[in-house]
UniProtKB/Swiss-Prot annotation:
SUPFAM superfamilies given in the database record: Anticodon-binding domain of PheRS (SSF54991), Class II aaRS and biotin synthetases (SSF55681), Nucleic acid-binding proteins (SSF50249), PheT/TilS domain (SSF56037), Putative DNA-binding domain (SSF46955)
SMART domains: B3_4, B5, FDX-ACB
Name this polypeptide is given: Phenylalanine--tRNA ligase beta subunit
Protein family membership: Belongs to the phenylalanyl-tRNA synthetase beta subunit family. Type 1 subfamily.
Length: 810
C-alpha cells in the first residue's frame, strides 16, 4: 500500500523524518519496501513565464525562448518541444538542479551554437508520466508567480511510503489504520475526519433483502441530481500517489474512502438498475449465485458464476460480484444523474471464495478477505455521502439499511502482568539494567491502540478490544504480542528462559522415532519426505473442500505410491536405484468417519554395488532375501524379531514374493517385490522391493520398560554343540512357523537356528519339500554335555512331528 506522508500527517501529527518513521513502522510489522521522496524530483525546478519564442537560426525543430524565472533578467533556453510558445507558464529546471528521473544535472550548454541556461520540462522528465507529447503548460488562471517552486503545484512536495503489512488486518490497508499505528508508536496526536452522522428518509423506492448469512449489513443510499465530472485536483493527486487511476468524481470518491477508511464502497447507476430490474422501485438482494448465471464485470469480462459466489441482485438479476467487482451494465458513466451507493459487510470467507472462483483479486476483495470493521461502516458511508454532495452535487432521497445482527460485537480479554513478563522477559532500562515491564507500561501501550483496560485484580486487567481489532486480538497471547511489538522487540534484554526439571528432554515417542531414523540411515536408506496432498482417484481418499490445485486436492492413502514415484524419478534422471525410507501420516475415510495413522515406508532395488568390473560389467540386482535382510537388520538393532507370512492383498506386489509382517502376534505391515508388470510399465529395474509398516504398532513394542535401557550380554567362553535337523514337510508350512516352534522347544539352551538347505524335486514326496536346519546349543556358564543336549533336541524333533507332521530324515 502506498502512503502519502502529507495525507498521513493530516491524520496524525508526526514530524519524524521519512526514514525514521519508516524504520519504526518496519519494526512494528509494517514493512516499508520503498521510500519515494518526490521532493527530490523537482528540486530546483521553478515556474517560468515564456516571454518570447524565436526559431533557432541553425535548427528547424528547436526554439530559442526568453523565460522569466524570477531573476533580475530573463534566461535564454533552447527548447525542442513543438508546443512551446510565448505567454505560457512552464516548469523550468534551473542551472545546477538535478532531475533524478532522467539522471540529468543542468549546466550551461550550447545547442547548435546558441547558449541555453536551463530546461523547460515535460511531466515525464519530472517523473509524473511515462511519456509526454511536449512540455507541461500550467493553466493561466492558476495564480502563478515566476520563480515559485513547482513541487507543490504538481504534487512533488510529498513523500510516499510503499509498505506491506505482515499482519492479516484489514485496518492495516487504510490511512486511518496506519495513522492509529503511528499514534501508538510515537504518541503523536490523532485527528480523524469530522463526520456527523445524518438520518435520511427510508422510502419504498428501495428495498433490501439479505438472503445469505455471508452479509450481515447492507445499506443503500439513493442520491439524485449528481453531475459526473473529473475530480478536483487534490483528489486526483491523492489517488495518483496511492497508485490508483482516476475515473470520475463519483468513482474516485469511493476509492478515496477505500484508502482512507479501508471500507470498500460501490456506486451503481440507479436508472440502469431500474432498467435491469424492470421497475422504478428497486429490490436489491444479496444471495449465492445460481448455476449458469453470468455477469459482465467492470473489466469487460463475461463471467460464468460459480454457485459458491456471492452476488448483488436487482430484481433477482446479478449486477455485481459482492465484495469483488461491480457489473458493467450498471456502472456510473458520463450520463449518470442518479446513484445507488452501496456500503456493506461481507463475510471474509465468502468473498475469498467468490474471488477465487473467478481468478479475480481486487482492492475491495483484499480488504473484505481480511475482515473490515462493521462498526465504522456508517461513518465511512456518511463520509462518502458528504464528499459526493460537496463534489458531485445532488440530494439524498432515501437510505435503506438491512442488518441481521442488531447488537454491536463486544470483545474482552483477561490479561495478566505476570504472564506478560514470563513470556517476554525483561526490557533494557536506560541505565542498561534489565527490568520487568510495569503496569503503567502495559496500560500506556494498549491504550494507545484503542484498548480499554479495567483493573480487576492485582496486575490483572479486563481488556476491551476496539472494534477495528476484533479479528486479530482474540486471546491473551495476542495482547502480549501487541505489547512486545509496540514496546519494540529490540528493546528487550537478552536472557534465557527459566528452565524446569524436564526442559529440553524429548518425549519417548520422538526419541524412538529418531532412533528408527538413525538405524534406517545406518543400513543405507536415505530419508525422504513427500507431500501429503496427492491427486484424487479413490473413494477412500479424504478430499479437500477448497484446494489450491486440482492435482493436490486429496490426502494420501499410503506412503508406497510416493516412494514408487520417487524411485522412478531418480531412475529416469540417471541417479541409479533409490534406497530410501519415509515416516509420515496417511489418511482415509470410511462410513463412520475420517481416520489417520502414522506409517513408515521404504523402497530399494536395482544394483547398488560399485564393483561391476569384477563381473564383466554385468549388473547384479539385489534379490528377495537380501532385501528382506535389510529389513530384518533394522529390527535386530532394536532386539525385535519379525515373522513373515505369505500375503497377496496388494496387487502392486508380486503375488509369490510378498509377505505380511507380524510382531509378537500384531500385524506390522507388508514387504515384497513390486509386481513385474508395474516395473515394466514404469521402466523400472526388474527387482524392486518395498515395505510399509504401521509405525504405531512398532512404537508400542519399543515403548516397553525392558527396552528403554540397553541390555548387554557377555559372549559365552564355552564351546557350542551343533545338531543338524532334516525333514520333509508340507510346502504350505512356512519356515517362520517351523523356526518359532524350534526356538520355543529349544528353550534357553538353544542359541541359534539356521536354515542351510532346501530341496524340492526327485525323491521328495509330492507337495512337500526337504528342509535342513542347524541348531546350535550353548550355555554361558558351562560346557553342555550330551545328556543335557539330547533331551532338548529330541523334544524339538517330537514337537515338529506332532505339530506339522514332518517326516524326519535326521
Amino acid at each position: 500500500m502506498r502512503i502519502s506522508l502529507n495525507w498521513l500527517r493530516e491524520l496524525v501529527q508526526v514530524d519524524l523524518e521519512p526514514e525514521v518513521l519508516a524504520e519504526k513502522l518496519t519494526l512494528a510489522g509494517f514493512e516499508v519496501e520503498e521510500i519515494e521522496d518526490r521532493r527530490t524530483w523537482a528540486a530546483g525546478v521553478v515556474v517560468g513565464r515564456v516571454l518570447e519564442r524565436e526559431q533557432h537560426p541553425n535548427a528547424d525543430r528547436l526554439s530559442v525562448c526568453q523565460v522569466e524565472i524570477g531573476q533580475a533578467e530573463p534566461v535564454t533556453i533552447v527548447c525542442g518541444a513543438s508546443n512551446v510558445r510565448a505567454d505560457i507558464w512552464v516548469a523550468v529546471a534551473t542551472l545546477g538542479s538535478y532531475l533524478p528521473c532522467i539522471d540529468l544535472k543542468l549546466k550551461p550548454t550550447k545547442l547548435r551554437g546558441v547558449r541555453s541556461e536551463g530546461m523547460i520540462c515535460s511531466l515525464s522528465e519530472l517523473g509524473l508520466t511515462k511519456e509526454s507529447e511536449g512540455i507541461h503548460i500550467f493553466p493561466e488562471d492558476a495564480g502563478l508567480q515566476a520563480g515559485q517552486p513547482v513541487g507543490p503545484l504538481l504534487g512533488l512536495d510529498d513523500v510516499v511510503l510503499d509498505l506491506t503489512s505482515t499482519a492479516n488486518r484489514a485496518d492495516a490497508l487504510s490511512l486511518i489504520g496506519i495513522a492509529r499505528e503511528v499514534r501508538a508508536l510515537t504518541a503523536a496526536t490523532l485527528t480523524l475526519p469530522e463526520v456527523e452522522l445524518q438520518t435520511y428518509p427510508e422510502l419504498p423506492c428501495l428495498a433490501i433483502s439479505l438472503q445469505s448469512e455471508a452479509c450481515s449489513h447492507y445499506s443503500g443510499t439513493i442520491i439524485e441530481g449528481v453531475t459526473i465530472a473529473p475530480s478536483p485536483e487534490w483528489l486526483q493527486k491523492r489517488l495518483q500517489l496511492a497508485g490508483i487511476r482516476t475515473i470520475n468524481n463519483v468513482v474516485d470518491i469511493t476509492n478515496y474512502i477505500l484508502l482512507e477508511y479501508g471500507q470498500p464502497l460501490h456506486a451503481f447507476d440507479r436508472q440502469k438498475l431500474q432498467a435491469i430490474a424492470g421497475s422504478s422501485d428497486l429490490a436489491i438482494g444479496v444471495r449465492s449465485a445460481q448455476a449458469g448465471e453470468t455477469l459482465k464485470t467492470l473489466d469487460d469480462q463475461e463471467r460464468t458464476l460459480a454457485e459458491a459466489a456471492l452476488v448483488i441482485t436487482a430484481g433477482d438479476c446479478p449486477v455485481a460480484l459482492a465484495g469483488v467487482m461491480g457489473g458493467a451494465d450498471s456502472e456510473v458513466s458520463q450520463e449518470t444523474t442518479q446513484l445507488l451507493l452501496e456500503a456493506a459487510w461481507f463475510e471474509p470467507i465468502a468473498v475469498r471464495r467468490s474471488a477465487r472462483s473467478q481468478g479475480l483479486r481486487t482492492e475491495a476483495s483484499a480488504r473484505y478477505e481480511r475482515g473490515v470493521n462493521v462498526t465504522e461502516l456508517p461513518i465511512a458511508t456518511q463520509r462518502a455521502i458528504d464528499l459526493l454532495l460537496q463534489i458531485a452535487g445532488g440530494t439524498v432521497i432515501s437510505q435503506t439499511v438491512a442488518t441481521t445482527t442488531q447488537t454491536e460485537p463486544e470483545h474482552s480479554i483477561t490479561l495478566r502482568l505476570q504472564r506478560i513478563n514470563e513470556l517476554l522477559g525483561p526490557v533494557q532500562a536506560e541505565d542498561e539494567e534489565l527490568k520487568d515491564l510495569g503496569a503503567d507500561d502495559i496500560e500506556r501501550l494498549l491504550t494507545a491502540i484503542g484498548c480499554h483496560l479495567t483493573l480487576v485484580d492485582d496486575a490483572v486487567w479486563q481488556v476491551r478490544v476496539p472494534p477495528y481489532r476484533y479479528r486479530d486480538l482474540e486471546r491473551e497471547i495476542d495482547l502480549i504480542e501487541e505489547v512486545a511489538r509496540l514496546y519494540g522487540y529490540d528493546n528487550f534484554g537478552e536472557t534465557l528462559p527459566p528452565l524446569g526439571s524436564d526442559e529440553g528432554a524429548l518425549s519417548i515417542d520422538e526419541s524412538l522415532r529418531r532412533q528408527i531414523r538413525a538405524v534406517c540411515r545406518g543400513v543405507g536408506l536415505t530419508e525422504l519426505q513427500h507431500y501429503s496432498l496427492v491427486k484424487p482417484g479413490s473413494d477412500r481418499q479424504v478430499h479437500l473442500a477448497n484446494p489450491l490445485l486440482a492435482e493436490y486436492s486429496a490426502l494420501r492413502l499410503d506412503l508406497l505410491s510416493g516412494l514408487i514415484d520417487a524411485f522412478q524419478y531418480n531412475w529416469e534422471q540417471g541417479n541409479g536405484p533409490l534406497w530410501g525410507f519415509e515416516i509420515g501420516r496417511i489418511f482415509w475415510r470410511e462410513e463412520d468417519g475420517f481416520f489417520e495413522a502414522d506409517r513408515m515406508g521404504g523402497i530399494l532395488g536395482g544394483d547398488p554395488s560399485r564393483g561391476r568390473w569384477q563381473r564383466g560389467g554385468k549388473e547384479q540386482a539385489i534379490d528377495w532375501y537380501a532385501a528382506k535382510g535389510v529389513l530384518e537388520e533394522i529390527f535386530e538393532r532394536f532386539g525385535l524379531t519379525i515373522e513373515f507370512q505369505p500375503d497377496r492383498q496388494d496387487d502392486r506386489f508380486h503375488p509369490g514374493r510378498t509377505a505380511s509382517l507380524w510382531l509378537q502376534g500384531d500385524r506390522l505391515g507388508r514387504f515384497g517385490q513390486l509386481h513385474p508388470s508395474l516395473c515394466e510399465g514404469r521402466g523400472l529395474p526388474a527387482e524392486v522391493y518395498a515395505f510399509e509398516l504401521d509405525l504405531d504398532v512398532w512404537l508400542d513394542h519399543l515403548d516397553q520398560p525392558e527396552r528403554q535401557v540397553p541390555r548387554f550380554q557377555p559372549y559365552s567362553s564355552f564351546p557350542a554343540s551343533d545338531r543338524d535337523l532334516a525333514f520333509f514337510v508340507d510346502q504350505s508350512v512356512t519356515v517362520a512357523e517351523l523356526e518359532r516352534i524350534i526356538r520355543r522347544q529349544g528353550g534357553a539352551l538353544l542359541s541359534e537356528v539356521e536354515l542351510f538347505d532346501q530341496y524340492c524335486g526327485e525323491h521328495v514326496p509330492e507337495n512337500q519339500r526337504s528342509l535342513a536346519f542347524r541348531l546350535t546349543y550353548r550355555a554361558s556358564d558351562r560346557t553342555l554335555t550330551e545328556a543335557e543336549v539330547e533331551p532338548v533336541h529330541d523334544q524339538v524333533r517330537q514337537s515338529l512331528v506332532e505339530r506339522f507332521r514332518v517326516t524326519l530324515r535326521s
